[in-house]
Amino acid sequence: MLSAIYYLFLVLLCTFFMILSAVALVVCMPFDKSRRAVHELSRVLVRTFFLIPPLWRQRVEGLEHVDRNKSYVIVLNHNTVIDIPALYYVPLNFRWVSKREVFRVPFFGQYLVLHGDICIDRGRASEALEQLLREGKKWIARGASVAIFPEGTRSKDGEIHRFKAGAFTLAREAGVEILPVVLDGTKTLIRKNGLFNWRNRITLRVLPPVPAERIASEDPHALMQSVHDDMSAALAEMRNNR
């Protein structure tokens, strides 16, 4: 019953913020090409979602690695839809890369469009990469970062699986750093039956960024494996420290 009430509250809250975002987009468009105003409204929405339940805890580590004046390609592990709001604890203006099917979800898809997120068709790999590079470089040029799940899909067992090359190709072509982010605890916030777990802790850790010079010079596959290993090691350490 409590979960149903909170879901209803979230629908009303998201509707309100969606209207605010549409107004902000129109009003700020002439001088806000990176859609920072819309993104900041999304951050307020996310903070509200996480802060109301009294026994939900969020721990954020490694923010000293974040330069708010830089654009990054953000890579993070993917377990559940809760990964998306959790990333808003990182103080950067970013655009998500998401599969086309998500943009077709009523209400949520419209929110992604307002936010300016990047839609790709995973069924057409070459076209998806072209779209990612074109749209990703556009947003980076405007001063935003781009957030990507390099595994390409959710992990069923909670481990970090093999990375795809798209995020690393974008970082190399755009000449920006890669910012690895590791999440733990998002998978347990919603139970398998769809009800909320009212006692939950999420930990987000930002790892040191990968310099653009290293991305440009190092073998792409070796670089992907190195970042993967660093993130996996961080996840194991976070779990040991629960």
Label every model-predicted segment:
Residues E130-R242:
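Non-catalytic C-terminal accessory region of glycerolipid acyltransferases
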Residues M1-R57:
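N-terminal membrane-anchoring alpha-helices
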Residues E61, V97-K99, I120-R122, P150, ...:
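Thr-Gly-centered strand-to-loop micro-motif
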Residues G62-D67:
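Glycine-rich helix-loop-beta junction characteristic of Rossmann-like nucleotide cofactor-binding loops
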Residues R59, T80, R104, L132-L133, ...:
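Amphipathic coiled-coil/heptad-repeat helices and related helical stalk/stem segments
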Residues S21-E40, I52-P53, R68-A125:
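Catalytic core of membrane glycerolipid acyltransferases/transacylases, capturing the structured
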Residues V60, I74, W96, L204-V206:
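Generic preference for hydrophobic
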Residues P53-E61, L129-E130, T186-T188:
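Short gly/ser/thr-rich secondary-structure transition/capping motifs
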